[in-house]
Protein backbone atom coordinates (compact mmCIF):
# COMPACT_ATOMS: atom_id res chain seq x y z
CA UNK A 1 0.00 0.00 0.00
CA UNK A 2 1.51 3.39 -1.00
CA UNK A 3 2.36 5.92 1.70
CA UNK A 4 0.02 8.93 1.88
CA UNK A 5 1.52 11.86 0.03
CA UNK A 6 2.94 14.39 2.44
CA UNK A 7 2.20 18.04 1.69
CA UNK A 8 5.18 20.11 0.70
CA UNK A 9 6.64 22.11 3.54
CA UNK A 10 6.61 25.82 2.72
CA UNK A 11 7.34 29.01 4.60
CA UNK A 12 3.61 29.79 4.70
CA UNK A 13 2.67 26.38 6.13
CA UNK A 14 5.40 26.64 8.76
CA UNK A 15 4.36 30.15 9.81
CA UNK A 16 0.66 29.30 9.90
CA UNK A 17 1.30 26.21 12.01
CA UNK A 18 3.68 28.12 14.29
CA UNK A 19 1.08 30.85 14.84
CA UNK A 20 -1.54 28.19 15.63
CA UNK A 21 0.85 26.62 18.15
CA UNK A 22 1.53 30.01 19.77
CA UNK A 23 -2.23 30.71 19.91
CA UNK A 24 -3.01 27.36 21.51
CA UNK A 25 -0.05 26.85 23.84
CA UNK A 26 1.69 30.21 24.18
CA UNK A 27 4.94 31.61 22.88
CA UNK A 28 7.02 29.69 25.41
CA UNK A 29 5.76 26.38 23.95
CA UNK A 30 7.15 27.19 20.51
CA UNK A 31 10.29 25.27 19.65
CA UNK A 32 11.55 23.76 16.44
CA UNK A 33 10.97 20.36 18.03
CA UNK A 34 7.30 21.08 18.95
CA UNK A 35 6.68 22.63 15.54
CA UNK A 36 8.31 19.66 13.81
CA UNK A 37 6.12 17.29 15.77
CA UNK A 38 2.99 19.15 14.66
CA UNK A 39 4.06 19.11 11.05
CA UNK A 40 5.44 15.58 11.11
CA UNK A 41 8.95 16.63 10.10
CA UNK A 42 12.35 16.78 11.76
CA UNK A 43 13.81 19.98 13.16
CA UNK A 44 16.30 20.06 10.31
CA UNK A 45 13.47 20.56 7.79
CA UNK A 46 12.98 24.15 8.98
CA UNK A 47 16.49 25.26 8.12
CA UNK A 48 15.58 25.34 4.43
CA UNK A 49 13.14 28.14 5.20
CA UNK A 50 14.56 29.82 8.33
CA UNK A 51 18.22 30.05 9.39
CA UNK A 52 17.29 29.92 13.09
CA UNK A 53 14.48 30.30 15.61
CA UNK A 54 14.92 34.09 15.67
CA UNK A 55 14.06 34.22 11.95
CA UNK A 56 11.02 32.03 12.60
CA UNK A 57 9.86 34.46 15.30
CA UNK A 58 10.35 37.38 12.89
CA UNK A 59 8.24 35.51 10.35
CA UNK A 60 5.43 34.95 12.86
CA UNK A 61 5.51 38.64 13.83
CA UNK A 62 5.42 39.50 10.13
CA UNK A 63 2.34 37.33 9.69
CA UNK A 64 0.54 39.08 12.58
CA UNK A 65 1.46 42.52 11.22
CA UNK A 66 0.18 41.41 7.81
CA UNK A 67 -3.18 40.37 9.28
CA UNK A 68 -3.44 43.73 11.04
CA UNK A 69 -2.53 45.83 8.01
CA UNK A 70 -4.78 43.86 5.66
CA UNK A 71 -7.70 44.41 8.04
CA UNK A 72 -6.86 48.11 8.22
CA UNK A 73 -6.54 48.45 4.44
CA UNK A 74 -9.87 46.71 3.98
CA UNK A 75 -11.53 49.17 6.36
CA UNK A 76 -9.94 52.17 4.66
CA UNK A 77 -10.93 50.94 1.19
CA UNK A 78 -14.51 50.17 2.23
CA UNK A 79 -14.95 53.16 4.53
CA UNK A 80 -15.71 50.88 7.51
CA UNK A 81 -13.94 52.94 10.15
CA UNK A 82 -13.82 52.51 13.89
CA UNK A 83 -17.37 53.12 15.19
CA UNK A 84 -16.05 55.56 17.81
CA UNK A 85 -14.80 57.88 15.10
CA UNK A 86 -16.37 59.93 12.38
CA UNK A 87 -17.89 57.72 9.65
CA UNK A 88 -15.85 59.06 6.75
CA UNK A 89 -12.64 61.03 7.02
CA UNK A 90 -12.44 64.06 4.81
CA UNK A 91 -9.58 66.34 4.04
CA UNK A 92 -10.63 69.86 4.89
CA UNK A 93 -9.21 73.04 6.28
CA UNK A 94 -8.92 72.83 10.07
CA UNK A 95 -11.13 75.15 12.07
CA UNK A 96 -11.39 75.93 15.76
CA UNK A 97 -14.31 73.53 16.05
CA UNK A 98 -12.67 70.81 13.96
CA UNK A 99 -8.89 71.02 14.27
CA UNK A 100 -8.23 67.35 13.58
CA UNK A 101 -7.37 65.87 10.23
CA UNK A 102 -8.37 62.32 9.34
CA UNK A 103 -5.18 61.18 11.09
CA UNK A 104 -7.01 60.53 14.37
CA UNK A 105 -9.66 58.50 12.57
CA UNK A 106 -7.05 56.42 10.77
CA UNK A 107 -5.02 55.86 13.95
CA UNK A 108 -8.13 54.77 15.90
CA UNK A 109 -9.08 52.42 13.11
CA UNK A 110 -5.56 51.01 12.99
CA UNK A 111 -5.55 50.54 16.79
CA UNK A 112 -8.91 48.77 16.55
CA UNK A 113 -7.58 46.44 13.82
CA UNK A 114 -4.46 45.69 15.84
CA UNK A 115 -6.52 44.94 18.96
CA UNK A 116 -8.81 42.68 16.95
CA UNK A 117 -5.83 40.77 15.52
CA UNK A 118 -4.26 40.38 18.96
CA UNK A 119 -7.55 39.14 20.43
CA UNK A 120 -7.50 36.47 17.72
CA UNK A 121 -3.83 35.70 18.39
CA UNK A 122 -3.21 36.46 22.10
CA UNK A 123 -0.01 34.45 22.17
CA UNK A 124 1.53 36.92 19.72
CA UNK A 125 1.20 39.99 21.97
CA UNK A 126 4.63 39.57 23.57
CA UNK A 127 6.12 38.71 20.20
CA UNK A 128 4.97 42.01 18.68
CA UNK A 129 6.27 43.94 21.68
CA UNK A 130 9.70 42.39 21.23
CA UNK A 131 9.71 42.41 17.42
CA UNK A 132 8.69 45.88 16.19
CA UNK A 133 8.23 46.43 12.48
CA UNK A 134 11.67 46.20 10.95
CA UNK A 135 11.86 43.54 8.24
CA UNK A 136 11.65 44.43 4.55
CA UNK A 137 8.29 42.61 4.29
CA UNK A 138 6.86 44.49 7.26
CA UNK A 139 8.04 47.84 5.92
CA UNK A 140 6.61 46.92 2.51
CA UNK A 141 3.23 46.31 4.17
CA UNK A 142 3.48 49.68 5.88
CA UNK A 143 4.32 51.32 2.54
CA UNK A 144 1.12 49.78 1.10
CA UNK A 145 -0.79 51.41 3.96
CA UNK A 146 0.75 54.81 3.20
CA UNK A 147 0.00 54.47 -0.53
CA UNK A 148 -3.61 53.55 0.24
CA UNK A 149 -3.99 56.50 2.61
CA UNK A 150 -2.57 58.82 -0.06
CA UNK A 151 -5.05 57.39 -2.58
CA UNK A 152 -7.81 58.38 -0.14
CA UNK A 153 -6.54 61.94 0.13
CA UNK A 154 -4.37 61.71 3.24
CA UNK A 155 -0.67 62.36 2.85
CA UNK A 156 1.43 60.45 5.38
CA UNK A 157 4.59 62.20 6.53
CA UNK A 158 7.97 61.06 7.78
CA UNK A 159 6.74 60.80 11.37
CA UNK A 160 4.12 58.19 10.52
CA UNK A 161 6.33 55.15 11.19
CA UNK A 162 7.02 56.44 14.70
CA UNK A 163 3.33 57.11 15.22
CA UNK A 164 2.32 53.65 14.00
CA UNK A 165 4.93 52.09 16.31
CA UNK A 166 3.71 54.21 19.24
CA UNK A 167 0.08 53.15 18.69
CA UNK A 168 1.20 49.53 18.26
CA UNK A 169 3.10 49.47 21.53
CA UNK A 170 0.45 51.38 23.48
Language-model segment annotations:
Residues 1-34, 38-41, 51-55:
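Basic, helix-initiating cap at the start of DNA-binding domains
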Residues 12-20, 24-25, 55-75, 105-113, ...:
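Alpha-helical structural segments
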Residues 28, 151-157:
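Short, charged helix-capping/linker segments at alpha-helix termini
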Residues 63, 67, 152, 170:
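Phosphate/oxyanion-binding loops and surfaces in catalytic or ligand/nucleic-acid-binding neighborhoods
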Amino acid sequence: MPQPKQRALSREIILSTALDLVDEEGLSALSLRSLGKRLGVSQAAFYRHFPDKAALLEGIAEQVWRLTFESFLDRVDTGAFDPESTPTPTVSEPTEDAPASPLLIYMRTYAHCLAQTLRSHPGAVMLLLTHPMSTPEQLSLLARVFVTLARHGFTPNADMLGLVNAVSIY
